Amino acid sequence: MLRLLSKRFYCKIATKSNEKATKLYFKQLTHPTKVPQTPVDAEFPDTSASEIQIDTKTIQLLERLSLVDLDSERALATLKSSIQFADKIAHINTDHVRPLYTVLEHQQLQLRNDQVTEGDCRAEVLQNAKVTDEDYYVSPPGNIPLEQ
């Protein structure tokens, strides 16, 4: 395996960066941070009491776009609970919350230079696919026939 990694240039870079990577010491992260150390109770309206109504046109559109069969009661219940959860999240007040870019605020992330190391390897990549058509991957269809 090591011989295989040493042949490819991008694998050499990956193994070198792993050797140079420093360990994260979580005990060092005791500094003041924007992330609260204990959960904060958020007050937002409970929307679980309101019944979600979904018409058949919307269900058919979702089935066609997502290739998921929503005929069963269990699938509809899951869809309705997902909508209620999204509605709860939409009502959370985030007026005075600054955006968080990384949880490790005071620790630098090691990034490598973005360099193209290998190119024009379409044939090698397409060898990994089970089914191809005109130099494209063919993905298996979902549980709904595409003839609709």
Curated annotation (Swiss-Prot):
GO MF annotations, alphabetized: ATP binding; glutaminyl-tRNA synthase (glutamine-hydrolyzing) activity
Keyword presence, Zinc: no
The reaction(s) this protein catalyses: L-glutamyl-tRNA(Gln) + L-glutamine + ATP + H2O = L-glutaminyl-tRNA(Gln) + L-glutamate + ADP + phosphate + H(+)
E.C. numbers: 6.3.5.-
Keywords: ATP-binding, Ligase, Mitochondrion, Nucleotide-binding, Protein biosynthesis
A Pfam family reported for this protein in Swiss-Prot or TrEMBL: GatC
NCBIfam families assigned: gatC
Entry similarity comment: Belongs to the GatC family.
Record-given protein name: Glutamyl-tRNA(Gln) amidotransferase subunit C, mitochondrial
Taxonomy of the source species: Eukaryota, Metazoa, Ecdysozoa, Arthropoda, Hexapoda
